[in-house]
């Protein structure tokens, strides 16, 4: 019985460790994707011409 308890605890511990490693990798990839999106947005802002705040090119009166 003691052998079963030890092996069960070992399996659960190893499963928890592998799960935490997977979560960490997932978090890192999400952060990289967010950084890429932010870089794209900043590039788009740099390429667009400067306009005063509140300016809209299509005004409907």
From Swiss-Prot:
One Pfam family this sequence matches: FSAP_sig_propep
Compositionally biased region (Acidic residues): 30-41
Record PTM 4-hydroxyproline, positions in chain: 53
Predominant localisation class: secreted
Tissue expression remark: Expressed by the skin glands.
Keyword terms of this UniProt record: Amphibian defense peptide, G-protein coupled receptor impairing toxin, Hydroxylation, Secreted, Signal, Toxin, Vasoactive, Vasodilator
Annotated region (Disordered), positions in chain: 24-61
Cited function: [Hyp3,Thr6]-bradykinin: Induces relaxation of rat smooth muscle from tail artery (EC(50)=56.7 nM) and contraction of that from ileum (EC(50)=588 nM), urinary bladder (EC(50)=4.6 uM) and uterus (EC(50)=3.9 nM). Binds to both bradykinin receptor B1 (BDKRB1) and B2 (BDKRB2). In arterial smooth muscle, the effect via BDKRB1 is stronger, in uterus, ileum and urinary bladder that via BDKRB2. [Hyp3,Thr6]-bradykinyl-Val,Asp: Induces relaxation of rat smooth muscle from tail artery (EC(50)=3.5 nM) and contraction of that from ileum (EC(50)=223 nM), urinary bladder (EC(50)=1.5 uM) and uterus (EC(50)=356 nM). Binds to both bradykinin receptor B1 (BDKRB1) and B2 (BDKRB2); the effects via B2 a stronger.
Name listed for the protein in its UniProt record: [Thr6]-bradykinyl-Val,Asp
Naturally occurring in which organism (per UniProt): Agalychnis callidryas (Red-eyed tree frog)
């Amino acid at each position: 019985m003691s052998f079963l308890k030890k092996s069960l605890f070992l399996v659960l511990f190893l499963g928890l460790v592998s799960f935490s490693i997977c979560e960490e990798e997932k978090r890192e990839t999400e952060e990289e994707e967010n950084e890429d999106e932010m870089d794209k947005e900043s590039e788009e802002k740099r390429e667009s011409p400067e306009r005063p705040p509140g300016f809209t090119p299509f005004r409907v009166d």
